[in-house]
Amino acid sequence: MSFIKETKKWYFIFLAVWTLIADVPFLFMLFTSFKTQSELLSGNTWQIPRQPTIGNFSTVLEGNFFTYLKNSVIAVSISVVLILIISSMAAFAFSRFKFALNNLLYSLIIAGMAIPIHVTLIPIYVLTNKIKLYDTVFALIGPYVALSLPMSIFILTEFMREIPLELEEAAKIDGCSMFRLYSDILLPLSAPALITVGIYNGTYLWNEFVFALVLTSSPTRRTLPLGIWDFQARYGSDIPAIMAFLTLSLLPMLIAYIFGQDKIIKGMMAGAVKG
């Protein structure tokens, strides 16, 4: 009994230390965003601001922040919706239909996870120019969706394969069509996996930098990760303003998590147990 208590004590100590370590970058970002440039350079980097100021946030909001935010919301939200629709349909086909090329097609799609996504930059750039989508927010949606599909299809297919076939057979006996089987039965049962896929892709695409850099050039077409450039000069950078920009960029994802944390945690836990 004492051994179990001792183990639990060290376990909680480890979690507390790990939480503190994980929070250090966030605390640095938050503290620095309320400092002036002179205070940051002259004082202790890690100390709490002596004279907190919201001037950095005012500077950020007076710039193009809301334009970058709008572009990010458009690109990410449309991409995630398309990813969920396409990957769930593909997973439904791979998990429920038996056809000649089922395993081959599924293997080819999964093999896409092994391809470094940035090797496609030049072909995508050339294609985007040819179809006149370069330097638009919509130029990002195609690559975002295509490059996210292999992992998404893999997660959803493996999840749907665990759903008992008896449910499908009972639905067919009751006259359920294939579309209703997909939309009314498998999709609700796959909600945990869909939530996991949505979180995974939404978080990654919100912070995606390279494709946004290559496929857009105008300041009015940039997404949030590119907006940091507004505070970088030739001989230095406004670090407090950059930290304020990052803090504001984090808020939408943080707010979404706060209001949906119950569903997110239940979905991810259920997905882990189901798999």
From Swiss-Prot:
Q: Pfam family example for this protein?
A: BPD_transp_1
Keywords assigned: Cell membrane, Membrane, Transmembrane, Transmembrane helix, Transport
Q: Where in the cell is it found?
A: Cell membrane
User: Which spans are transmembrane here?
Assistant: 11-31, 74-94, 108-128, 136-156, 185-205, 239-259
Q: Which GO terms describe its cellular component?
A: plasma membrane
GO BP terms, alphabetized: transmembrane transport
* Domain ABC transmembrane type-1, residue spans: 69-260
Keyword check for Cell membrane, yes or no: yes
Q: How does it sit in the membrane?
A: Multi-pass membrane protein
Q: Which family does it belong to?
A: Belongs to the binding-protein-dependent transport system permease family. MalFG subfamily.
Name listed for the protein in its UniProt record: Putative ABC transporter permease protein ORF2
Q: Which organism is it from?
A: Caldicellulosiruptor sp. (strain Rt8B.4)
